[in-house]
């Protein structure tokens, strides 16, 4: 019999929110009787934007902005129907992107 697995990837700009969401998911899955591995921190994606401060000239004067995307991975092994129902009813913050693969 093959093991079933639910893989959950979380993405957010704020690392505190993503850690809280991951803890909620892990706690809910463990309470419903499933095995959980994670949250596993994945590499943080950093995007840097460089713009010229002045309107017309002064190309040497620039400003840089960065955007960091934090990612976490959670694997739920042998989920029960109770686990799936509990995860569907979970309330998570709006700043967290959730990607679920069965």
From Swiss-Prot:
Gene3D superfamilies: Ribosomal protein S10 domain (3.30.70.600). The keyword Ribosomal protein applies. Keywords: Ribonucleoprotein, Ribosomal protein. InterPro entries: Ribosomal_uS10 (IPR001848), Ribosomal_uS10_CS (IPR018268), Ribosomal_uS10_dom (IPR027486), Ribosomal_uS10_dom_sf (IPR036838). The keyword Kinase does not apply. GO terms for biological process: translation. Coiled coil: none annotated. GO terms for molecular function: structural constituent of ribosome; tRNA binding. It holds the Pfam family Ribosomal_S10. One of its GO terms (cellular component) is ribosome. Involved in the binding of tRNA to the ribosomes. Belongs to the universal ribosomal protein uS10 family. Part of the 30S ribosomal subunit. HAMAP family: Ribosomal_uS10. This is Small ribosomal subunit protein uS10. It comes from Macrococcus caseolyticus (strain JCSC5402) (Macrococcoides caseolyticum).
């Amino acid at each position: 019999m093959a093991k079933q697995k639910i893989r959950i990837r979380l993405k957010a700009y704020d690392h505190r929110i993503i850690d809280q969401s991951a803890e909620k998911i892990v706690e809910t899955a463990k309470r419903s009787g499933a095995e959980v591995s994670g949250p596993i921190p994945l590499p943080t994606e950093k995007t840097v934007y460089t713009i010229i401060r002045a309107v017309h000239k002064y190309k040497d004067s620039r400003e840089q902005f960065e955007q960091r995307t934090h990612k976490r991975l959670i694997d739920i092994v042998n989920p029960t129907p109770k686990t799936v129902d509990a995860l569907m009813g979970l309330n998570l913050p709006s700043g967290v992107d959730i990607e679920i693969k069965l």
